[in-house]
A protein has these predicted regions:
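Hydrophobic helical membrane-anchoring modules
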Residues: 1-19, 165, 190-406
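Conserved donor nucleotide-binding strand/loop of the catalytic core
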Residues: 50-57, 68-96
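A conserved hydrophobic helix/loop-capping motif in glycosyltransferases and polysaccharide synthases
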Residues: 23-32, 39, 59, 375
Length: 406
């Protein structure tokens, strides 16, 4: 099964002095001999024209067409990254950057590096992260396939905004700029195309000041290395696995509620759409509620893991976590379990009194057994969450607070 590839260690800011350099332009490249010189020269000329002290770094990702030599001849500092991937090249380039600000853009001439100064202005004004927006700017004819322009980018950007409340208009624009000293906090690790999504997500979760500027998007020089569906899926997959709320909690709670409604309609013989819903409807509702409870529990576990091990916060979850303890989960699970057990016990008692004859209380039995299963899930889920919380308690023991001075 395909997995999201990540770097073994986070990229950190270069320890080189930054007093003399304001900007590092980082350009990843893989066989971009036709366009790399123009990108490097435009970057250098733009910085010279605006009095910006900076450098251009080309992160070569295994080119065999002379791209590194052409970039070096044009005035760039070339570094080599053997690990394949869009993110790998950028991580290597970021680690070598020495400027106060990092401007990033592709090597295929789709982005105009003469716009560098426009990205620096918001950073000097206090922004942390500046993104270009092709959709609010100008997309030249032939620059972006209609599938990307009207389906892929809007859908993925919408999903990202829904999950992480970023409020950006073009989440996958490749021309961006940010403060280099934020690299340790961003903790960027993905090595593939989903790197673009990770950068936006991490910036949003950290509460950084994200701003957008409209830019122009030009037809690329050379052959495109994008794969519409596989790269789109990589981005969507990354968004899902980094949002337990939308991946687990929302569908899980939705399934529980729908299952309860369906089950209640059948259990209490509520007429709907002109008919009575029988036993099979209750079975379907019970199964839906059980599966939903399990999925929602996975979401709570993922949220707990993200808090203790990744340092991620969610206002609502943090309030619930602060108020609820293991005992609350055990009590809730026990109540659900005992309710189901009583229902099943009543059915068993009736069946015994009938001499184990015909059982006409199947609906009550199924509902009771469903509650028993859900109660067990809640009980053991509460124990699992408590185990995840051991990390907090162990840290408190390892690093006790010094006694107050008396």
């Amino acid at each position: 099964m395909s997995e999201i590839q990540t770097a073994s260690s986070p990229v950190t800011a270069s320890s080189a002095a930054t007093d003399e350099l304001l900007v590092s332009v980082v350009i990843p490249a893989l066989n971009e001999a036709e366009s790399i010189e123009a990108c490097v020269r435009r970057s250098i000329e733009t910085m010279e024209n605006h009095g910006i002290r900076g450098e251009v770094i080309v992160a070569d990702n295994g080119s065999d067409d002379g791209t590194p030599d052409l970039a070096r001849a044009a005035g760039a500092r070339v570094i080599y990254e053997q690990r394949k991937g869009y993110g790998s090249a950028y991580l290597a380039g970021f680690a070598s950057a020495r400027g106060k600000y990092i401007v990033m853009g592709d090597a295929d001439e789709t982005y105009d590096f003469r716009e560098i100064a426009r990205f620096i202005e918001p950073l000097e004004d206090g922004a942390d992260f500046v993104m270009g927006s092709r959709l609010r700017g100008k997309i030249h004819p032939g620059a972006m396939p209609w599938l990307h322009r009207y389906v892929g980018n809007p859908v993925l950007t919408g999903v990202l905004n829904l999950f992480f409340r970023t409020g950006v208009s073009d989440a996958h624009c490749g021309m961006r700029a940010f403060r280099r000293d934020l690299l340790p906090r961003l903790d960027l690790r993905t090595t593939g195309m989903e790197f673009a999504s990770e950068q936006v997500i991490r910036s949003s979760k950290l509460g950084l000041d994200i701003r957008e500027i409209p830019i122009e998007y030009h037809p690329r020089t050379g052959e495109s290395k994008l794969s519409s569906f596989s790269d789109g899926w990589r981005h969507l997959r990354f968004l899902l696995v980094h949002s337990p709320t939308w991946l687990f909690l929302v569908p899980g709670i939705g399934m529980v509620l729908l299952g309860v409604v369906i089950g209640a309609i059948s259990l209490f013989n509520v007429p709907l759409f002109g008919r009575q819903w029988q036993l099979h409807t209750l079975i379907a509702g019970s199964m839906l509620a059980i599966v939903g409870a399990q999925v929602a529990q996975l979401g709570v576990s993922a949220r707990t893991y993200a808090f203790y091990y990744l340092g991620e916060h969610d206002p609502l979850f943090d309030r619930l976590r602060a108020r609820l303890r293991l005992e609350h989960g055990l009590i809730a699970g026990a109540l659900v379990f005992l309710t189901g057990l009583v229902m099943a016990g009543v059915v068993l008692g009736i069946w015994i009194n009938r001499g184990f004859g015909e059982l006409r209380e199947e609906k009550l039995a199924i509902a009771g057994l469903a509650l028993v299963v859900i109660g067990i899930q809640i009980i053991f889920g509460a124990f699992f969450l408590s185990i995840l919380g051991l990390r907090r308690r162990s840290r408190a023991l390892e690093d006790p607070q010094p006694p107050a001075a008396g």
